[in-house]
């Protein structure tokens, strides 16, 4: 989460949270949005990542929050890699001249299902931290105000923990997460529609 507070893309990392509903993905999404503030996130969905007008909304944003993808949706690998890496891209606002931007927003992708990808190379998976949300909270045990409480009451502590974790990730070279993602490459490749 601390990487999402940085105004650079030098680590080339995005986050994909995966799991069936009722497990906290939307709480985390709300906390991330609360952490960066309403004016500092975009919400360009996967099917619009090739749209130059939509991509322009990511200019100077810390986070691009993708809230769901269809089970049969394809991961737009080239666009995802370019955004996560902060590559130069020409975008435009309506009725304005095109301009070049280097996005630095962290892609936060919350999904019930892993999207299919045409690119099963290391390049895409080296860029995505894939976090499993395996525990479904029974409806009677859910705190429907949890996200609101965390954002309103716990944000200073959350930001401190996020920045401390980011500093540790930088020191370790993000090594642990990279090993975790190797296992996901195998899982995703086995599910690939070849």
Where are these regions (language model features)?
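Feature primarily recognizes SF3-like P-loop helicase cores of small DNA viruses
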Residues: 2-194
């Amino acid at each position: 989460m601390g990487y999402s507070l940085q105004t650079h893309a030098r680590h080339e990392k995005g986050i994909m949270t995966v799991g069936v509903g009722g497990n906290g993905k939307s709480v985390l999404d709300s906390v991330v949005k609360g952490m960066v503030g309403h004016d500092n996130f975009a919400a360009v969905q996967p099917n619009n990542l090739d749209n130059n007008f939509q991509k322009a909304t990511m200019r100077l944003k810390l986070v691009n929050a993708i809230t769901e993808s269809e089970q049969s949706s394809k991961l737009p690998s080239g666009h995802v890699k370019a955004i996560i890496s902060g590559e130069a891209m020409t975008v435009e606002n309506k009725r304005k001249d095109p301009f070049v931007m280097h996005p630095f927003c962290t892609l936060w992708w919350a999904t019930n299902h892993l999207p299919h990808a045409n690119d099963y190379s290391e390049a895409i998976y080296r860029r995505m931290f894939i976090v499993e949300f395996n525990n479904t909270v029974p409806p009677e045990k859910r705190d429907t105000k949890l996200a609101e409480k965390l954002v309103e009451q716990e944000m200073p502590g959350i930001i401190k923990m996020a920045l401390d974790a980011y500093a540790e990730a930088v020191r370790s070279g993000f090594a642990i997460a990279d090993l975790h993602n190797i296992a996901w490459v195998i899982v995703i490749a086995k599910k690939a529609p070849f």
